[in-house]
Amino acid sequence: LPVVGTRRAYLCGHDEVHSLAKNMDGADVRFWMGFGDHYINVFTVLKNIGLLSEQPVKLADGSEVVPLKVVKACLPDPSSLAPEYEGKTCIGDFVKGTKDGKERTVFIYNVADHKEAFNEVGSQGISYTAGVPPVAAAVLVARGTWDVKRMANVEDLPARPFLELLGDMGLPTRVIDAT
């Protein structure tokens, strides 16, 4: 992957998979996410000892708790971790299709630097990449650029003004040939 290098990726669930598959006829949409070895090790241990379960368990005193809720309660506030985050994110889409009668694959992506994001907004790069796009969308609606007068998913709207505004807001979109 550009900037961050080769990473192991895991197939995950994500909201966008559903709307994209529904709204893009014939699309094969999957969401993959990279995690570091430490995260995977911790996740595996928690899973193996049942702490990721959403099913209540009875304690020795007779009370019941949901293991996953206990884990969530014990985790630090994610914003408290932001000052120590280092490195960069790379979030993108591999898009396969046909253009001008030729098969083509492109990788469309953006990169956020954790330290730069923290210096700008007091949060880490993942939150930055999650927060800037909805703000850009709101600006386009407020300006009347996106004025469809109905509920719509982003993929239903003209992409160019959105991608240009993301760049203006500090989250430029890059496209490389991945054929």
Feature-to-residue mapping (PLM):
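C-terminal catalytic/substrate-binding lobe primarily of soluble NAD(P)-dependent oxidoreductases
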Residues: 1-179
